[in-house]
């Protein structure tokens, strides 16, 4: 399970899903 961390520059993958600007996805 990975997440998409949204930045102004673009998207970056992350394994952690803390509450905030991160959107979790089951598959990536």
From Swiss-Prot:
Disulphide bond pairs: 3-24
Q: Which GO molecular function terms does the record list?
A: acetylcholine receptor inhibitor activity; ion channel regulator activity; toxin activity
What SUPFAM superfamilies does this protein map onto? Snake toxin-like (SSF57302)
Q: Which domain of life is it from?
A: Eukaryota
Keyword tags: Acetylcholine receptor inhibiting toxin, Disulfide bond, Ion channel impairing toxin, Neurotoxin, Postsynaptic neurotoxin, Secreted, Toxin
Compartment list: Secreted
Q: Which GO terms describe its cellular component?
A: extracellular region
Tissue localization of expression is: Expressed by the venom gland.
Its function? Binds and may inhibit nicotinic acetylcholine receptors (nAChR).
Q: Member of which family?
A: Belongs to the three-finger toxin family. Short-chain subfamily.
Q: What is this protein called?
A: Nicotinic acetylcholine receptor-binding protein Mnn-3C
């Amino acid at each position: 399970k990975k997440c998409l961390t949204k930045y102004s520059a673009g998207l970056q993958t992350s394994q952690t899903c803390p509450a905030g600007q991160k959107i979790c996805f089951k598959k990536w």
